[in-house]
UniProtKB/Swiss-Prot annotation, chains A, B:
Residues annotated as the enzyme's active site: E128, E137
Subunit note: Interacts with pab2.
Annotated ranges, domain SAM-dependent MTase PRMT-type: 16-311
Catalysed reactions, semicolon-separated: L-arginyl-[protein] + S-adenosyl-L-methionine = N(omega)-methyl-L-arginyl-[protein] + S-adenosyl-L-homocysteine + H(+); L-arginyl-[protein] + 2 S-adenosyl-L-methionine = N(omega),N(omega)-dimethyl-L-arginyl-[protein] + 2 S-adenosyl-L-homocysteine + 2 H(+)
Protein name as catalogued: Protein arginine N-methyltransferase 1
Any GO BP annotation: regulation of DNA-templated transcription
PANTHER family noted in UniProt: PROTEIN ARGININE N-METHYLTRANSFERASE (PTHR11006), PROTEIN ARGININE N-METHYLTRANSFERASE 3 (PTHR11006:SF53)
Length: 340, 340
């Protein structure tokens, strides 16, 4: 995996912040727009289906720069309401203006939970709400609030389905670069940091050849029916080694579907698909496993908002591995991670 | 230049933050420690000069994980005081402990301006205070406070010299990727964002072959004598084209020197030196220049903390270019940038 180390602000005597945003206010929008797996999937789902959008009332939850709202207007929507709490919406207003769509798109700054749309119901809700590991700092809660309050009984959601997949990977080199590094830092023992680094899932790109098991769906969301409480979940999993190899980590990614389209449109953020800015999420195990093709790793993954901070995710993975031959020890671990 | 787009948090309906730190609290420390141009320069400046550190009292301003304090202890310092306002200092305490240096290193959480050291004076101040473009969110103000309050008259500063250099670059492809992109975003005009993007210096790596002028020192700081007010500066510059080429941007970087060392140690964050996490800083011009080898670009660069937010930097660049032949138009611009 590329060693594009991640950054944080917890450094320095004064606020010597290395937030990327501290030197690029537009970078995230540039990155999301240039993520064409993401943006073209939305564009095609919307603009290839004018028969679904023509003369419809659309709500764009978390409209950002307004790109999805403009796709909907181009697809023939009667009117689009874009809602975003961020200051970006002031730019979105200017963008909609220069693109001469102000008469068909109304942008509202505020929290979905607090604002009042000028309409009772909408026919379609579009939203790009997904976060890392699908649920980390995602806007799904907000989309569900919008759905329950505004979506007409026969209304449509774009997208309307999301799945999280789990597999395992061989990752010796990068694991030692990310975890082992702290054992000897220029001759000093940094193990007090190592144990915290271990608890933190790593968001990064993984080469498909690192995956050495099949994958298992650990969450399958139908956005039309899912409830907020379903987003805290516990799922058993069983994955099977596809070759003789070592396992150093579990790997998670998500897939998205727009099933309301004439021809269903899907995209994956997994290692077998093109790069997206969501990358994948790596959970390093403490023990390394020596697996043979056909052997199982069985376990349970639990994910819930952290106590006291609902923007953080607590993810626990308990697994057991029983090798076929007695010359390899059975392995089982109960691992706890936090995305924060 | 690699298109590693920068990220910000100004996105989404709920706090869908893409701060890198939102998924790596240790990444910045990992990145800084793994920046071996940085870390090995400090290590060598300190540990190759035990004759300067033996039995001395040292203050480490912004000690972070404590690595510099530990270098000083290893170099024979009698006692090291490490000060940092961030929570990281709790980890530093544990790290110093496991490395059995607690008797020689005292770590204090707080603002340099507010805390009281248990000593009247220190013999040496070490600090890694540099930010992007040297001064952006840097800790230099704080180092100067520490110097004026605690450094003995004949005391030493590590480092004790910093320079900012300015040159020009050819950067057509990346300029169109970063600036031109906003002209046509999936068929929409995003020019309202383009004009803001232009005002923001880009922190990124630049290939040495892109540099097509000589460089000019625009700031030269002697840390023993510099005053806080000197950090708001205005400097004339004159740079000379080294080949027939096009100029798309000005480029700034900084160089650091530890001149107190037996053998002075220097490192550069410029395009002609190895990668550092500070990269370089790019200021895109609005007009592109057609220059011939030997022709001058003359101007003035002004840098000061932004009104109302001293963590932001206002940087103005005014320049004039007079080509030798009349068939090329003279060009002059007054450009304003903000690092925020």
């Amino acid at each position: 995996m590329p060693g594009n180390t991640k950054k944080s602000a917890d450094s320095g005597l004064t606020a010597k912040d290395y937030y990327f945003d501290s030197y690029s206010h537009w970078g995230i929008h540039e990155e999301m727009l240039k993520d064409d797996v993401r943006t073209l999937s939305y564009r095609d789902a919307i603009m290839q289906n004018p028969h679904l959008f023509r003369d419809k009332i659309v709500l764009d939850v978390g409209c950002g720069t307004g790109i999805l709202s403009m796709f909907c207007a181009r697809a023939g929507a009667k009117h689009v309401y874009g809602v975003d709490m961020s200051e970006i919406i002031h730019k979105a207003v200017q963008i909609v203006e220069v693109n001469k769509l102000s008469d068909r798109i109304t942008l509202i700054q505020g929290k979905m939970e607090e604002i009042q749309l000028p309409v009772e119901k909408v026919d379609i809700i579009v939203s790009e709400w997904m976060g890392y590991f699908l649920l980390y700092e995602s806007m799904l809660d907000t989309v569900l609030v919008a759905r329950d309050r505004y979506l007409a009984p026969d209304g449509l959601l774009f997208p309307d389905r999301a799945q999280i997949q789990l597999a395992a990977i061989e990752d010796a080199d990068y694991k030692s670069e990310k975890i082992g590094f702290w054992d000897d830092v220029y001759g000093f023992d940094f193990s007090p940091i190592k144990k915290d680094v271990w608890k933190e899932p790593l968001v990064d790109t993984v080469d498909r050849i690192a995956v050495n098991t099949n994958s298992c769906v650990i969450l399958d969301l139908d956005l039309k029916t899912v409830k907020k409480e379903d987003l805290a979940f516990s799922s058993p999993f069983e994955i099977t080694a596809t070759r003789n190899d070592f396992v150093h980590a579990f790997l998670a990614w998500f897939d998205i579907e727009f099933s309301a389209c004439h021809k269903p449109i899907k995209f994956s953020t997994g290692p077998f698909s093109r790069y997206t800015h969501w990358k994948q999420t790596v959970f390093y195990t403490h023990k390394d496993l020596t697996v043979k093709a056909g052997e199982y790793i069985r376990g349970t993954i639990t994910c819930k908002p952290a106590e006291g901070n609902h923007r953080e995710l607590d993810i626990d993975i308990s697994y057991t591995f029983n090798p076929r031959e007695p010359n390899r020890e059975p392995v089982s671990e109960d691992l706890s991670y936090r995305m924060c």
